């Protein structure tokens, strides 16, 4: 539905790589030297170009072509990661997760909806908003998209820091 910033921020959709991993050099610094030798950056870039070659571009403007590119990359890469994580986390906790907007039929339909319908009046998710306009209160209908809730827990932060330090001190670990 076009809610992520790389759909509407030119500095993100104009990048010559996956926009959600634009800080790859910083991430690679976390890995140990043996893993760094694997040329991960080049591998990621080659997957990006391979994905671009898989896209069926329509006779569209440059602007719409970029949007189609972002939608395709989002479906094939970013959303796959989110769905895999959600699925494994829910299964671990014996919870059956439903993701109705990720159904094959909806995804295929939305892939072909022109961007002007998806991002209308400077507001993301326009198709979804319009579909539910008569059912939602105005304050929800007009609410800006916000990411999944984040919580702050000092106990959890301390736990994760200690776990990371333990992992980093393990010489057999790839980090």
Predicted regions and their residues:
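Adenosyl-5′-phosphate
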Residues: 20-175
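Active-site donor/metal-binding and catalytic loop motifs
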Residues: 1-6, 147, 151
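A mobile, often basic/glycine-rich helix-loop segment
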Residues: 2-28
